Every structure is written in C-alpha cells, then in structure tokens.
Amino acid sequence: MAKSVSISYLALEQIFNDTIGAGEIKVAGLLVGHPVNGGVHIARTIPTSRGTVTYVRISAEEISRAVEELNPGEKIVGWYHSRPGQGVFFSQDDIETHEKCLDFNPYFQALVIDPHQAKYGTPMADCVRFYTVRNHKEVPIHGYKLTGSSMQSYYDPKEFVFDKYGFPHHYTLTHAGKTKISHRKSNMDASFEYDVFICHAHEDKEFFVRELAEKLHSKGLRVWYDEFTLSLGDNLRRSIENGLAKSRYGIVVLSKRFFEKEWPQKELDGLVAKEVEGKKVILPVWHGITREEVQSFSSILANRLAASSEKGIDYVVNEILRVLRKKSV
C-alpha cells in the first residue's frame, strides 16, 4: 500500500468534467502518474469508458490503448469511476477488481465519485473518496494536503467545499489523518471555462479533428469541441457563441473545406473580434493546405506561425501545449 497519495488539481478537474458531463451514466477512467517517495502522485487522467445507468467497466482493450498514450515516465497508477446519485462506496465487484490490481501493483489507487453531490457549499469528502482493499474489505483513504505552499499542513477533506463553478476549494485549516492526499491547483487560467475552442469544418472531423480533440483532452486540457459539448436540442449559434466567450484560445483548423464553409468562418470572426480587444487567442493549424492557399483566404492568418498536420497529430498537440504552458507561466 502506498504511504501517501497526491493528486493534482488538474486531475481532479478532469474527473469532474468527465463524470458531471455524463449525467446519469456511469463512467470510468484511468489515473496516470508515477511513484514518488514510497507513495503515488496522480498527475492526470485518461477517460476510457461510458457505461449505463447501472454498470461500467474498463476493458482490456481500453487499458491497452491508454498505455499507448502514456508519455515517457508516466504509469497507470489507478482507476476511477462514478456513481451518480448513489453516494461513494466500493461494491463487491469493485473490491474484487481492485484486489486483482493490487496483485500486480501494490500502489494502485481507486477513486469513487458521486458527481450529483458536487454542488455549491457541499464538502468534497461527500462525493469524492479514495479506496484501497485490505482483507477483502474496502478501506477509505482520508486526509488532504495542500502542496506548493509554505504551510505544509494537513487538511480535512470536509474543509474542501464546492464553489459556484462546481470545483472544490479549501477554506479552513484543520489537522487530518494518516495517508495523505495532496490537492494542487493547476496553473491554467481559471477565469475561463475552457482552455481551447476548436474551430473546424465538419468534413475534417473523421481523419483529424476528432483525434486532435481527444488527444488534447487526454493531456488535461478543457476542450470546447462540439461532439464533447453540445447536446440534443441545444441552440447551435448560442452554444457556439457561449463557447467562444468562455475559451482562452481558439484552435482554427484551416483546410480547403474550412474555406468553403460559412459556420467555421463565423466562428473565426468571433475569435478575430477577441483579438481586436488586444488578446492573442488564435492558434492556427494548417491541414492539407499550402501557404499560398491560406494567403488567398487571409493574409493575416498566412503570416501567423502555424502548426501543420503534415508533421503528425502528436506534433500539433505538443505545439499547442507548448503555447498554453508558456502563457500560463
């Protein structure tokens, strides 16, 4: 069993986004991080599974795909799943599953969340809990630690209370338990609901944009992408305008199809309007086009440094991450 467990605010945020967005459906995913000083640090998550209102499981195929996504030095260090409206507890299936995990990795962690409890003023301990297993019984892990602070003190999980945006913040200092769980805030700009808005033509989804959105999401970014964000019955124009306003940057996937479409160009106009206010927000990606073709559409965009899909999707993802991390320092 790990002596301590730390989890980044980014990983918590990913879990909340994944589980709250699923509504009544149970979801599951993997915890990604690395061992540290006899314990485990959870840096981010990889959402893997959508189940039903009664059941969810992570398949061997999903685990294999997740392993292929790992960066150098990263490991799968645990799993999480949601119980919407049911409270936080380990079922007998959870116990048996986690015992199998512990057989090959004694540091493996399990996190259970009831996203329906993530309401304003509610203690985080009421809806998020870590578990391990001992003697065929679940053992809840208590105690939270705030890192990156000169005050290396322990915090009772009940003192992390949900704010009006649905994320936990620490309010009152107390002393808490044995196994330590750290709570560390992301350096991404919290004033925006999304880190990036993806502006694209529908025809580019299948072979490029969908995978780009999924990879950015797996890296911990809050992504406004229509297939992630829009629901049946949503007002398309209003939802897009709302997404543009609440996004820190706009990724514009420029392609031949993009230049032919009206909606993507309206989205681009919205991003250009934000830049008129003195904010650099447009991150251009060239997909299957030349500089001359971009020039014929917009000389301003042609003179922007852009990432090209010809160099591979991982290159594009890394270039976007590099810009965002540079701006968040």
UniProtKB/Swiss-Prot annotation:
Signal peptide boundaries: none
GO MF terms, alphabetically ordered: metallopeptidase activity; NAD+ nucleosidase activity; NAD+ nucleosidase activity, cyclic ADP-ribose generating
Residue numbers binding NAD(+): A201, H202, S231
PROSITE patterns referenced in this protein's UniProt entry, alphabetically: MPN, TIR
Catalytic activity entry: NAD(+) + H2O = ADP-D-ribose + nicotinamide + H(+)
Enzyme class, first EC level, given as a word: hydrolase
Enzyme Commission code(s) on record: 3.2.2.6
A Gene Ontology BP annotation from the UniProt entry: NAD catabolic process
Domain of life: Archaea
Annotated ranges, domain MPN: 5-134
Pfam families per record: JAB (PF01398), TIR_2 (PF13676)
Chain coiled-coil ranges: none
List of catalytic residues: E267
Record domain TIR: where: 192-324
Keywords (A to Z) from UniProt: Hydrolase, NAD
UniProt-listed PANTHER family: EUKARYOTIC TRANSLATION INITIATION FACTOR 3 -RELATED
Domain-level remarks: The TIR domain mediates NAD(+) hydrolase (NADase) activity. Self-association of TIR domains is required for NADase activity.
Function: NAD(+) hydrolase (NADase) that catalyzes cleavage of NAD(+) into ADP-D-ribose (ADPR) and nicotinamide.
UniProt protein name: NAD(+) hydrolase TcpA
Organism: Theionarchaea archaeon (strain DG-70-1)
Gene symbol of the encoding locus: tcpA
